[in-house]
């Protein structure tokens, strides 16, 4: 008899798991509370402006392509992606700009400010991150290893310690090899992919630089939501039954097994396995009603990653100095991280990510206008949340900073504005305290590991998404779905012996 899989949540991790389970011959039902598939990969359009509400950068497209290849199909028949050799532009408070290209040689050629020594150090750092990337690919990515003990068993103690560089933080690893203060800050902010601090995260996450340099940085034509649409189409072709606008209210259990879910319609649906794309702590808290003591213990080790104050701006002008992806850096990176991740306050001088897809895709804004998305990282929702007045003052800080750093009269040119706070993110995606990136990567608290993909409390409950390994970001959450499918397939194969 065909076994039934229930997937809770249609984010990239959930839809990826659903596709792989259907490809493996299971009956799969996916329940998504919103009316779209993709989770935070969401879309907003108004007054001729188009905005990616969630992620704006596609990396490691091969992870997505694998899902189509399992069905003997090509992703290019479903969605068009475009490589961006000019990866981004970094603006610094003193007026310095650095353009990051795909390739160290190209970066050197396009930045007269960088010396021969700077480029040699950057190449040396790339070589270091390549070694980490290669070893993480072998075990962490290919085999879905979930814990430090599994890493050590797979690679051997000495090999794991040296090649994963568990001795240093990410910023220590950078500062050890890079002397240019601008490059130090730019490379440290690669930690944005997982919403953490480069001063707290383990050095293993330095691999993010090599990953982007080797795999490239991509744009999904028409908006990144088209990638989610492509995955939804593939899932339906593989026989996944998708229920949008349907919320799971709780998970039913018997001893250490989950038996099914109760929907907001009152209907009970049985399952042999449940895969939750809802974050781990909210799943335990709201769907399984774990006790406060257990939840507090889990949250101490697996604290939420950062959230964001996200502004979607339609502006009645063009800023020629902007590229597709831009970063406006802070005067003091350490203080910025300290305020967000330790003091838990809105930062005085935030580093700001600004994406302007209209630079690549002119369909995203009216002629002569630009669509600007602004994202500084801020703390997740605290026990005493920030007020409307706090956010209003923070908005002014952001606009002041951008105008000071070259976006002249930005306020005057804003003709459309849509803002998302951590509270909006929590409400729409049921994320833990409004975090964007799942669990924070912290060398002391969790050595950079997230929750394991298999529940520690229930034998047939699995998790996917940013709160489990291999972590946050579009390719990683998609990979988590594939890894969970592999685990269930291996378990079923073992049971049949």
From Swiss-Prot:
Cofactor(s), by name: FAD
Pathway: Carotenoid biosynthesis; staphyloxanthin biosynthesis; staphyloxanthin from farnesyl diphosphate: step 3/5
Gene3D superfamilies linked to this entry: FAD/NAD(P)-binding domain
GO biological process, one term: carotenoid biosynthetic process
InterPro entries, alphabetized: Amino_oxidase, Carotenoid/retinoid_OxRdtase, FAD/NAD-bd_sf
GO molecular function, one term: oxidoreductase activity
Residue positions binding FAD: 7-19
Any Pfam family: Amino_oxidase
Alphabetical keyword list: Carotenoid biosynthesis, FAD, Flavoprotein, Oxidoreductase, Virulence
Chemical reaction(s) catalysed: all-trans-4,4'-diaponeurosporene + 2 AH2 + 2 O2 = 4,4'-diaponeurosporenal + 2 A + 3 H2O
EC identifiers of the protein: 1.14.99.-
Enzyme class: oxidoreductase
Record function comment: Involved in the biosynthesis of the yellow-orange carotenoid staphyloxanthin, which plays a role in the virulence via its protective function against oxidative stress. Catalyzes the oxidation of the terminal methyl side group of 4,4'-diaponeurosporene to form 4,4'-diaponeurosporen-4-al.
Family affiliation: Belongs to the carotenoid/retinoid oxidoreductase family. CrtP subfamily.
Protein name: 4,4'-diaponeurosporene oxygenase
Species this chain originates from: Staphylococcus aureus (strain bovine RF122 / ET3-1)
Taxonomic classification: Bacteria, Bacillati, Bacillota, Bacilli, Bacillales
Gene transcribed to yield this protein: crtP
């Amino acid at each position: 008899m065909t076994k039934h899989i229930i997937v809770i949540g249609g984010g990239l991790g959930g839809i990826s798991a659903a596709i792989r389970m259907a490809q493996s011959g299971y009956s799969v039902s996916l329940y998504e509370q919103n009316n779209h598939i993709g989770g935070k990969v969401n879309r907003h359009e108004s007054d001729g402006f188009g905005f990616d509400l969630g992620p704006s950068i596609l990396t490691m497209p091969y992870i997505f392509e694998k899902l189509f290849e399992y069905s003997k199909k090509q992703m290019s028949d479903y969605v068009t992606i475009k490589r961006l050799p000019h990866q981004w532009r970094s603006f610094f408070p003193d007026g310095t700009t650095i353009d990051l290209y795909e390739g160290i040689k190209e970066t050197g050629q396009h930045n007269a400010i960088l010396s021969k020594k700077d480029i040699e150090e950057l190449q040396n750092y790339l070589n270091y991150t390549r070694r980490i990337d290669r070893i993480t690919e072998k075990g962490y990515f290919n085999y879905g290893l979930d814990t430090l003990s599994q890493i050590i068993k797979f690679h051997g103690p000495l090999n794991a310690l040296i090649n994963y560089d568990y001795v240093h933080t990410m910023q220590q690893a950078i500062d050890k090899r890079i002397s240019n203060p601008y490059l130090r800050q730019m490379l440290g902010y690669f930690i944005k992919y997982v919403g953490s601090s480069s001063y707290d995260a383990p050095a293993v996450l330095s691999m993010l630089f090599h990953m982007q340099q080797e795999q490239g940085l991509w744009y999904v034509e028409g908006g990144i939501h088209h990638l989610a649409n492509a995955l939804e189409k593939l899932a339906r072709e593989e026989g996944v039954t998708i229920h949008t606008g349907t919320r799971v209210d709780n998970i039913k259990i018997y001893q250490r097994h989950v038996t099914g879910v109760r929907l907001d319609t009152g209907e009970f649906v049985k399952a042999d396995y449940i895969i939750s794309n809802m974050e781990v702590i909210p799943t335990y808290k709201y769907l399984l009603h774990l006790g406060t003591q257990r939840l507090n213990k889990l949250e101490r080790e697996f604290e939420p990653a950062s959230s964001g104050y996200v502004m979607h701006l339609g502006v009645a002008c063009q800023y020629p100095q902007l590229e597709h992806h831009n970063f406006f850096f802070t005067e003091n990176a350490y203080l910025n991280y300290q305020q967000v991740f330790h003091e838990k306050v809105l930062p005085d001088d935030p580093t700001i990510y600004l994406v302007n897809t209209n630079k690549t895709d002119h369909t995203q804004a009216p002629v002569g206008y630009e669509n600007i998305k602004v994202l500084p990282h801020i703390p997740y929702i605290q026990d005493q949340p920030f007020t409307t007045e706090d956010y209003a003052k923070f908005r002014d800080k952001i606009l002041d900073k951008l105008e000071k750093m070259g976006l002249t009269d930005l306020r005057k040119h804003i003709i459309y504005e849509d803002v998302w706070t951590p509270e909006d993110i929590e409400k729409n995606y049921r994320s833990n305290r409004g975090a964007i990136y799942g669990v924070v990567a912290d060398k002391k608290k969790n050595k950079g590991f997230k929750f394991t993909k298999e529940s520690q409390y229930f034998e047939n409950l699995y998790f996917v998404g940013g709160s489990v390994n291999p972590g946050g970001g579009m390719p990683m959450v998609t990979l988590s779905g594939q890894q969970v499918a592999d685990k269930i397939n291996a378990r079923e194969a073992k049971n049949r012996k």
